């Protein structure tokens, strides 16, 4: 296998840590004095400076110094964790403990090894996009002989120089780790196999150098091309060196004396190598003088990151060995290593990966549905589709029933208008109907549902039909107009005058006179385009639609005829413009002179196209239609303001209505997972002013529609995008994550602390920014939090700097039109019932 490194090597010093253990029981019993003290996190001090013959420095500084009470977890987290985790990124690394006997080397390395391997496994579990392989091996050097700790035969192994891997141990056992329990089992085997013995200084003294190696290899799980098919391979070594000792202190003899000689000789060679490396590689460095230095050669100034933990005893009896350890540490911190990322990009590895991919594809081609699980999945999918089809058929049948019912009710309503015409000078002809003329049943395909004073009816195939309060009568009754006028009762006249707002007695006389003048030309009422510009045309005073009867239409969506002729002779200064209605099918009539489906005055019609599903109304298109309706209603209201009656509504009740609607919108925002930026703009722009009624109503109906769609498991179409409850929740999560990144950019440190305090976030907690954005707009019932949330989001998105540009976000102009700016405060609530 061909191994290459990244062209740029990272050059760094060896990390040197010093750990000073407390006095043990034997030293305390012997009344030993502690001559060493850690004065800060980087410096250790020798306190007995008055001792004779002391020519050593009294203070030593290193990367990190740990007192006796510091746990092994802190030593790992602060010092060696970063180096140990380099192995999963393709960088070789080594961690070893150096020190005198009974100073705590084995105790320290046991904890470091377990913590590091646990973090390596956590990293592997969190990065499932790559395939990892972890191999475990362990050896010991006992009396200059290499033994395999995973083998019980005790055979001595040989060292071999490999051109690719460097110095390797022949026939060393490598176990592929399965899980954490497997690792614990192997570590217990190594502990049992290692040579230990009892001396006067330590009851369990390590008599050999132990080296545990983890080799981590990772590659992408999917083939992403030759350039991306790289494999990373690196090793991490955990080395527990035997402690240096004096024979006079250890009182060793025989086997223990021989072991101590080999240990001291290998440690002396290691110290010589470290001292020469600290001087900049001047002269020959003989790594081959000891098997220990030969194995550690890559770790000492080579392709690896290295950390050395020097363990010390504070006892006065060990002061000379402690100073020797500190001198070794001072030389080690000057040694430089050049670690590289080991990337395997050989043609063999690429060929092997391509062969595996080819074999997998061939297997899928041979057995596309051979497994029982695949057949079961296919059968399950077919059953699900059948159930969906049956459900949709039932829904279609129900929608057709609702369409037929709505059409029949519409026909009955038109007949009622035709047969209940009453006449009086100055009063228009219209049917005896109430504000709510149908029982509230609305087609499920309707885009907006409103059961209060206005209703939307859909035939299931055409666009939703909006019936405004209009004053209509049949043109077939024009000839009998003079006969009907005298016979109309006064009671009925008064009732109709109460229903039609702002009709005065003077206007009634004027309308009656105009009606008498135009009665001689009833054909103008039926004209669709001939007299559109004439001064005597009735269409110039009343903007209405001429419809044909349902029996003569060309499509199922054509409405009945005889609806659109308004009352005649209204004065020019008080013209009323009604919103035009357009249907999905072309309206035709065999006996008509020209197309009667167009507006007689050329007024633009409100088009409400269907969504992609055919049954979902586009909210944006509907809002554009409401904008046009609002303009025309403004003209009506402007005319009414010039001397007409208004119902007096108390300001307190209007304020309560606004607060109720706003609270309902806040709760629907939370239910439908609406964007936080959308909530902020809407909350800050609409304060209950006179022109806000339109947008409050539109937003409320939009949210009700989305809530109903989500509760039934359906999709909602908004802005050309299909929304579901899951997708809206996902978009809201993405938006919160984006806002969390802006917190550090928009607010200073003091501002962030103040905001965290407002939202109850602890200053010393983690991921405070993410906690903050998760708290924004989280409680719609707490108006204080709502205002604070709007303020924070507005500052994050710089709402004040964007000005009027952001007032187009709903497809409407948020600035009130000129005809609304002169009206009384709170008058928007009065005009709401007449807008839809």
UniProtKB/Swiss-Prot annotation:
PROSITE patterns: KINESIN_MOTOR_1, KINESIN_MOTOR_2. Gene3D superfamilies: Kinesin motor domain (3.40.850.10). This is Kinesin-like protein KIN-7F. GO terms for biological process: microtubule-based movement. Residues 13-335 form the Kinesin motor domain. Residues 422-460, 588-611 are annotated as: Disordered. There is a cross-link at residue 707 (Glycyl lysine isopeptide (Lys-Gly) (interchain with G-Cter in ubiquitin)). It holds the Pfam family DUF3490. InterPro entries: Kinesin-like_fam (IPR027640), Kinesin_motor_CS (IPR019821), Kinesin_motor_dom (IPR001752), Kinesin_motor_dom_sf (IPR036961), NACK_C (IPR021881), P-loop_NTPase (IPR027417). Residues 588-607 have a biased composition (Polar residues). ATP binds at residues 99-106. Keywords: ATP-binding, Coiled coil, Isopeptide bond, Microtubule, Motor protein, Nucleotide-binding, Ubl conjugation. One of its GO terms (molecular function) is microtubule binding. Belongs to the TRAFAC class myosin-kinesin ATPase superfamily. Kinesin family. KIN-7 subfamily. GO terms for cellular component: microtubule; plasmodesma. Residues 344-420 form a coiled coil.
